[in-house]
Amino acid sequence: MSNTFLELREYQYAFSAGLEGWLAQENTSLLFSMNGKNLFALGRKADGQITLDDYDCEHAFALTAAQSQTLYLFTRFQIWRMENALPAGHTTDAGHDRLFVPKSANTVGRLGIPDLALDADGAVIFINPGFNCISRLDERYNFAPLWQPPFMPTPDRVTKGDCCHLSGMALREGRVTHVSSYAQSPVVDGWKNAIQNGGVLLDIAGHSEPVLGLTMPHAPRWHNGQLWLMNSGTGEFGRVDVTRGVFEPVLRVSGFVRCLCFIGDHYAALAASIPPDGEEFASLPLRQNGAKPTCAILIADLERGEIAHTASFFGKNAREIFGMAALPGARRPALVPLHSDAIQHVVTVGEMQNI
């Protein structure tokens, strides 16, 4: 597989030969955050040439997109809403067909949110590890708790302090069905003693068996009637047999897979990272298999069970991808960085209204 190798500021990156054509075939683009400081947009120019645009966005972590028109981005202590300012069929002078402009921010606190989504009612909900619950944005409070695991000690109130490290949620028809967690611990930092095989996927309604024995699981997602999951500490991506409560690996990669989104019927984008530092992560199975961990966006062919295309990142600053969203129908998205001078000058005006 031949590659295109390029350099972008403190990062170097390489694209597999077929990635450009695949983006055109699927008519999509990808946004992802790296190292909590940059947002990248992987897309195409009007002539089809692949592009990677880089935006300073300090403390950018989890993100999600709605209808390729709205972005929600978690930064250090806020959730931002960004809206596309371009009418359909219009582009910027540089050829971008989406321009996401910051519109509002909700202050939630330093919660370490790894996953967020819109529910069936259009509300922003998110995984809240710092308080061991699923939460919703609230107009009065920093957040409103919606659910906590049954093993937590106080069912009528949330517990402050990361006990089990909730890591992801699966929604079906806009309702949460499953939640992933590093451990089933009711005590603060208890998850750190269960990293090897204490991970779990819980059916929040209790209709199916929990999936046990996982290693730092992330990003449970429904797709075409099947539940998929990242077993991040082993580098595995696979399906969940919800009837038997069993994780069935489909492929393994040499990276800590944290983010997942599906594109069309047959493909999934996986975000692989260098495993986290720290003594508690030193003995992860991913570190013991002999393969050098990579930082990359990997396009998995679900029918073949293999990686079809890659965008790989190199250099000392290419380490962790924290959030990723696919934008179907968007060829080359751009955004106005949250703390740039441009945010003061990009002004969008609606139609005249009656007073």
Where are these regions (language model features)?
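Sequence-structural signature of mature extracellular/luminal beta-sheet repeat domains
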Residues: 1-355
